[in-house]
Amino acid sequence: MDILCSTLLLLTVPSWVLSQVTLRESGPALVKPTQTLTLTCTFSGFSLSTSGMCVSWIRQPPGKALEWLALIDWDDDKYYSTSLKTRLTISKDTSKNQVVLTMTNMDPVDTATYYCARI
């Protein structure tokens, strides 16, 4: 009976609920001061062409809180952190399921772990 109930429950769940969303960040581990950092977020399990979908970049300096950097949405609208907007560019390639963040004029204070996230 338990197996039957589980099977029936699975059959009533929309297929999109069962899809697995993954995001993977890639880029250099280190950049020198004044260089440009380019990070790529490759994702699966959703489409950035779908209305309401967004991808953000955030970072976390060692021992500090998360800091939001930038967001791009399905309609190619772009939003940036006020304090960093002159140094950041976010773009997307929906054919490759990728969002790219570039950050110019890197400085030691930019030392952090950088993450992308679906919003």
From Swiss-Prot:
Instruction: From the record, give the cysteines joined by S-S bonds.
Output: 41-116
In-chain residues carrying the UniProt-annotated modification Pyrrolidone carboxylic acid = 20
The UniProt annotation puts the region (Framework-2) at 55-71
Stretches for region Framework-1: 20-44
Q: Provide the Gene Ontology terms for cellular component.
A: extracellular region; immunoglobulin complex; plasma membrane
Ranges for region Complementarity-determining-1:
45-54
What does this gene product do? V region of the variable domain of immunoglobulin heavy chains that participates in the antigen recognition. Immunoglobulins, also known as antibodies, are membrane-bound or secreted glycoproteins produced by B lymphocytes. In the recognition phase of humoral immunity, the membrane-bound immunoglobulins serve as receptors which, upon binding of a specific antigen, trigger the clonal expansion and differentiation of B lymphocytes into immunoglobulins-secreting plasma cells.
> What's this protein's name?
Immunoglobulin heavy variable 2-70
Q: Which organism is it from?
A: Homo sapiens (Human)
Q: Which gene encodes it?
A: IGHV2-70
